[in-house]
């Protein structure tokens, strides 16, 4: 028998419960978001593209074989509890795609269709996932202390995490398409293009009203539970001026990086992705 495939969801490994998967439902692609508009007197329809993609339901046909009814029921119950206890988007990986991961939510219950109730059960694990397949390599930081370049190996512009130490101008891309200026910074500011926020490293907190906030950090999908009455100061956005009010992205191919000498360190976690 060949190697049995399994998944890992927020640290929960299906194989620890005797559960293994097949890959029929993991290779589909998400739909592009937009609106089809019919124009009188014109053949066909006009597609108003929004430039983004919809969420996708990822389904894993799964099975469990234990040999004993009591053990079977226990394992299913434990797996159901482990998956259902995770809230919000969590990291989802599987052995079919060892070089990438998704962000998914386990929202649906786990219904077992017993093939032989005392020995095995077949069922489907469903996750509501963001459209991107994030590359593991996109988590590796690229560090600059002077001008340089970065190469996006995919066909899609990424929304990076950028950590800036110092003050001055940073320009990414040809002709500095994605440019911003940092002022009054006395340490390191994190700029998160995915959630369009800027803040200090975790732990440096200031007054806020929400109980918690989800922040995509280097390990995309980590949920930072903030204490009641805390926040990042002004979200730090007031310290940064973005050219044309656009958060930085890294477009496909080699992209130049330019920065002022007063920027002492620039760390980019690129978050490469594909569909």
What are the residue ranges of the model-derived segments?
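Polar/acidic, low-complexity leader/linker segments enriched in S/T/G and N/D
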Residues: 1-40
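Short amphipathic beta-strand/extended segments with alternating polar/hydrophobic composition
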Residues: 14-20, 101-108, 179-185
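Short, solvent-exposed beta-alpha or beta-beta edge segments that form flexible loop/patches at the rim
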Residues: 24-61, 110
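Oligomerization/assembly interface segments of phage tail-like spikes and tubes
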Residues: 45-70, 119-133, 255
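Solvent-exposed loop and beta-edge segments used for protein-protein assembly and interaction
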Residues: 52-56, 84-86, 117-121, 154-156, ...
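Long, hydrophobic/aromatic-enriched structural stretches that serve as scaffold segments
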Residues: 61-97
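Short beta-strand and beta-hairpin "edge-sheet" elements
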Residues: 89-133
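Intrinsically disordered, low-complexity segments enriched in serine, threonine, and glycine
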Residues: 135-275
């Amino acid at each position: 028998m060949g190697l049995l495939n399994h998944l890992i969801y927020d640290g929960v490994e299906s194989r620890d419960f005797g559960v293994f998967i097949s890959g029929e439902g993991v290779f589909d692609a998400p739909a592009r978001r937009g609106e089809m508009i019919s124009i009188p007197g014109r053949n066909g329809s006009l597609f108003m593209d929004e430039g983004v993609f919809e969420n996708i339901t990822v389904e894993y046909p799964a099975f469990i074989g234990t040999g004993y009814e009591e053990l079977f029921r226990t394992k299913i119950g434990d797996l159901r509890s482990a998956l259902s206890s995770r809230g919000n988007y969590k990291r989802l990986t599987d052995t079919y795609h060892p070089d990438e991961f998704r962000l998914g939510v386990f929202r649906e219950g786990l219904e077992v269709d017993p093939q032989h109730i005392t020995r095995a059960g077949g069922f489907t694990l469903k996750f509501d996932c963001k459209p991107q397949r994030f590359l593991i390599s996109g988590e590796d930081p690229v560090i600059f202390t002077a001008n340089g370049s970065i190469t996006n190996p995919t066909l899609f512009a990424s929304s990076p995490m950028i950590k800036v130490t110092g003050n001055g101008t940073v320009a990414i891309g040809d002709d500095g398409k994605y440019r911003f200026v940092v002022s009054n910074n006395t340490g390191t500011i994190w700029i998160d293009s995915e959630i369009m926020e800027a803040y200090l490293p975790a732990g440096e907190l200031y007054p806020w009203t929400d109980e918690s906030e989800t922040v995509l950090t280097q390990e995309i999908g980590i949920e930072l539970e903030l204490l009641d009455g805390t926040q990042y100061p002004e979200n730090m956005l007031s310290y940064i001026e973005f050219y044309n009010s656009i958060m930085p992205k890294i477009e496909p191919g080699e992209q130049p990086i330019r920065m002022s000498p007063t920027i002492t360190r620039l760390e980019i976690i690129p978050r490469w992705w594909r569909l």
